[in-house]
Curated annotation (Swiss-Prot):
The modification Phosphoserine is found at S486, S488. This is 3-isopropylmalate dehydratase. It is an enzyme of class 4 (lyase). Catalyzes the isomerization between 2-isopropylmalate and 3-isopropylmalate, via the formation of 2-isopropylmaleate. HAMAP family: LeuC_type1, LeuD_type1. It holds the Pfam family Aconitase. The lineage of its organism: Eukaryota, Fungi, Dikarya, Ascomycota, Taphrinomycotina. The gene is leu2.
Length: 758
């Protein structure tokens, strides 16, 4: 009998298979997590869960925390303490809660007093925390960014943040393999941002649902690491669970000598292994897409979904020419929201603001490209504000060493401190109603950058060009100043931040208080008492009641719960704010026509919607808001992966259902027919009709019994121990404790370090 030959594997297969701790009969895997990034918005409830259950963080050294979403990007030279610097009470609450939690649980933290602070998806690669072949998670959907290194990186909800902290593992089912090959070289002046927007326009925001995308081809191989990060960053906007690019010499050169990268023999072993992380010849993919690089033009979004893209020389679409009624209605709503007319040129609309920043485009390469366009020019008079927000304190410092800050300042740009800034309106950097913005961020959802704000997604060079012209324009008009990834600007590229050991700005975490106050004014002791166990989730057997019809596709998480309501340290109280932008008018009064404002739908327990429900963020606030309203079941043809997963963590049941059945249920809901959803028997009964539905056995078991995932996982601690022992032997470079680099746990005294820059 001939020996068996292993089947060819994809890059995703290889990384996944090397991290499986346990495989259950139904296909659910216990997956080991190598790296965990943490920020202030999605972590408070996770730490509170640990505290309530009396659990510790299993591996504090494998977590890295920072603040980014809520913090102001104002100058910090006069900052005395966090409490006085952050004026928004709810933002201050989350930042102080994180700092207290970090102190209590002993994690590494880059706070506002540390020049290494920045956006989580900038500082991870910058520090060498992100490595090829690792699994990396964060309570943020754009964790997919790190897939540029050949890591399996994905966003998780708060319940899973708690699970990873407690067990260093996560429960997952394997996604499908999807390959997007980009053939040929990108034309002159085309950035990776143009490419990923083009791809999303081709496949749609649900094109990658249920899949991990591997990007490959000549165009991808020719990208820098920072450009690759922009690609993988927006794989989530394509609906994917993650995006990956095989590591190569470009990857290794970027990682080498980073503070947390392997050193010496560990480095040689690591690179030898990383070179094997390429898809095997004849590896099988479930979905394959071919893109011609020559087809990609400077690209801009016109609507309120990342799939609403046109080339800069294109016209705005006309819903009258769209046959699909749901899609036509979506286009019409987007046109009204964006203040655009069909069949007009996108360049004919003046802009009010420009934002260059975010985890998509705030790295040094992005700033160099923008500076090449800006140099020697002035921001147009009609542009009220043009902001440059570096992705980290070290990016800022590098840009200043190269003189980029002076180029921007002399042109009339505002040079800011590191943070998420205007990517989402959770901090003071926001659009006012009806302001139009050229933005290098990743989402153009309604209200994303501020209530009623209008967002056009573009590359850094395109954003810079728009600032100079005063309207969206073709960056190729600036040729001679910018080419494909090579700006004609002289910069001090010999500056090496690894030689920079200037100290922090002198603020200790002990300047925070031991008690923080939630937005409703209730004081919460974040070091409170510990109970003997976890509360688990509510049991789910049968849900009966009225179903609310919501005939909308691509209902994103920002629409379910707008960003201004995410600044809480509790899981409850969000139901009143669900669908706020379409449920209430500008005065906060109910819009009578919205379904949840009408009887009997005010008391709905079931929601019936269209495709790709829950697309967008990994934040668990969306299911919290629906659950708090009273919705326990959501029926739709398809769901965004992270939202789907988050529902189960909160005792809710999302049911993917064929479109024909959804349409029939939508009519029944409109006629106020009562629904009964029986999870035990897996049936939906409405009127005289009954349909069956599928649900994964393990998820069903947990819902029906109200089981705590963490408690179940801790029963397999022996398996986790064995996996970790083998990991230490086979992949020694993955253990942060072996690194010669210095991590800085949060200080417990008023003395500030004098050497904590990289």
């Amino acid at each position: 009998m001939s020996p068996s030959v292993a089947s060819p594997k994809t890059l995703y297969d290889k990384v996944w298979d090397s991290h499986v701790v346990d495989l259950q009969e139904d296909g659910t895997c216990l997956l080991y997590i190598d790296r965990h990034l943490i920020h202030e918005v999605t972590s408070p409830q996770a730490f509170e869960g640990l505290r309530t259950a009396g659990r510790k963080v299993r591996h504090p050294e494998l977590a890295l925390a920072t603040v980014d979403h809520n913090i102001p990007t104002d100058p910090r030279k006069d900052m005395k303490d966090i409490a006085s610097f952050i004026h928004q009470p709810d933002s201050r609450t989350q930042v102080l809660a994180l700092e207290n939690n970090i102190k209590e649980f002993g994690l590494t933290y880059y706070g506002m007093n540390d020049r290494r602070q920045g956006i989580v998806h900038v500082i991870g690669p910058e520090q060498g925390f992100t490595l090829p072949g690792t699994t990396l998670v964060c309570g943020d959907s754009h964790t997919s960014t790190h897939g540029a290194f050949g890591a399996l990186a994905f966003g998780i909800g708060t319940s899973e943040v708690e699970h990873v902290l407690a067990t260093q593992t996560i429960l997952q089912r394997k996604s499908k393999n999807m390959r997007i090959r980009v053939n040929g070289k990108l034309p002159e002046g085309i950035a990776s941002k143009d490419l990923i927007l083009h791809i999303i326009g081709v496949i749609g925001t649900a094109g990658g649902t249920g899949s991990v995308i591997e990007f490959c081809g000549e165009a991808i191989e020719g990208l820098s690491m920072e450009a690759r990060m922009s690609m993988c960053n927006m794989s989530i906007e394509a609906g994917a669970r993650a995006g990956m690019i095989a590591p190569d010499a470009t990857t290794f050169e970027y990682v080498k000598n980073r503070p947390l990268a392997p050193k010496g023999d560990d480095w040689e072993q690591a690179v030898a292994y990383w070179k094997t992380l390429r898809s095997d010849e004849n590896a099988k993919y479930d979905i394959e897409v071919e893109i011609n690089a020559a087809d990609v033009l400077p690209t801009v979004t016109w609507g309120t979904s990342p799939q609403d893209v046109i080339p800069i020389n294109g016209n705005i679409p006309d819903p009258a020419h769209v046959k699909d009624n749901v899609r036509a209605a979506s286009i019409q709503r987007s046109l009204e929201y964006m203040g655009l007319k069909p069949n007009t040129s996108i360049v004919s609309y003046p802009i009010d603001k420009v934002f260059i920043g975010s985890c998509t485009n705030s790295r040094i390469e992005d700033l160099r490209l923008a500076a090449a366009v800006v140099k020697g020019r002035k921001v147009a008079a009609n542009v009220k504000d043009a902001m440059i927000v570096p992705g980290s304190g070290l990016v800022k410092k590098m840009a200043e060493a190269e003189g980029l800050d002076q180029i921007f300042i002399e042109a009339g740009f505002d040079w800011r401190e590191a943070g998420c800034s205007m990517c989402l309106g959770m901090n003071p950097d926001q659009l006012k109603p009806y302001e139009r913005c050229a933005s290098t961020s990743n989402r153009n959802f309604e209200g994303r950058q501020g209530a009623k704000g209008r967002t056009h997604l573009v590359s850094p060079a395109m954003a810079a060009a728009a600032a100079i012209k005063g309207h969206l324009c073709n960056v190729r008009e600036f040729f001679g100043d910018v080419s494909n990834g090579s700006p004609s600007i002289i910069t001090n590229k010999n500056y090496d931040p690894s030689h920079d050991v200037e100290g922090d700005i002198g603020l200790s975490v002990d300047d925070a208080t031991d008690a923080v106050t939630d937005a409703d004014g209730i004081a919460t002791n974040v070091a409170g008492s510990v109970s003997s166990g976890s509360a688990g989730i509510p049991k789910f057997t049968v849900v009966e009641g009225i179903a609310a019809p919501l005939p909308m596709a691509n209902v994103d998480t920002d629409k379910i719960i707008p960003k201004q309501f995410l600044k809480t340290i509790k899981r409850t109280g969000l139901g009143q704010f669900a669908f706020y932008e379409i449920r209430y008018d500008a005065d906060g009064k109910e819009i009578p026509d919205f379904v949840l404002n009408r009887e009997p739908y005010r008391h709905a327990t079931v929601l019936v919607a269209h495709d790709n429900f829950g697309c967008g963020s990994s934040r668990e606030h969306a299911p919290w808001a629906l659950n708090d309203f009273g919705i326990r079941v959501i029926i739709a043809p398809s769901f965004a992966d992270i939202f789907f997963n988050n529902c189960f963590k909160n005792g809710m049941l999302p049911i993917p259902t064929p479109i024909e059945q959804v349409n029939d249920m939508m009519k029944a809901a409109e006629n106020q027919v009562k629904f009964s959803v029986d999870l035990v028997n897996q049936t939906i009964t409405y009127g005289d009709k009954q349909v069956k539905f599928d649900v994964e056995p393990f998820r069903k078991h947990c819902l029906v019994n109200g089981l705590d995932d963490i408690g179940l996982t801790l029963q397999k601690e022996t398996m986790i121990d064995a996996f970790e022992a083998a990991r230490e032997e086979n992949f020694p470079w993955m253990n942060i404790k072996r690194s010669r680099a210095r991590l800085s746990p949060v200080k417990s005294n008023k003395q500030s370090s004098s050497r904590n820059d990289w």
